[in-house]
């Protein structure tokens, strides 16, 4: 992003502060936003960065334009989105984001002040509605079978914990399949947090607060997110500054799936 000293940068998915810290270390000023209050409260920035260059806001990046203007933080040099979960959310949040945390509740809320949970969806949606959630948010090939198995299971006992859901998936497809787990958990998390709608709003708001030569950097982790970013690049005078996404070679599967796209204004060539 070519960080400029005293330049303004919005870290729209603050997380554990990695992007913000890198920008601060190069002399930039950061407005960090995160929907998860625990992410902000747990952050410890390096003293050398100086606290005055970092402002943190608990909020939804769907409201990025409003948040930036309320904090008198615009126009900005760049906005950064990293759409993956943080390691803390996966391993320590206790909200059932990971299919490996078998005893955790099926919560999956980024913002625990909201009411909608994965547990509610699994125990109240109809079979056709569950199928729609799974197919639309993950394109899981066994969505219909899994939705049907959930309906059968909950007639006898509500789905409460992660292992209740993974057991349903096992029975539906006849085997243990980590990829199926990942896709179904992804689909529920997206639905609970309205991630696709928020991303569209966040990109739209970002386009309104960047400078004429400003950039929007987005790291996605699956094709549905990436599709939203590519489609957005054809609207509102925005274009992809680099045609092909930047990808990282890594032994870690989640890093291999990451794609970085850089967007900017068409008028700035």
Task: Pin down the residues of each PLM region.
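S-adenosyl-L-methionine-dependent methyltransferase catalytic core, i.e., the SAM/SAH-binding region
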Residues: 1-46, 51-269
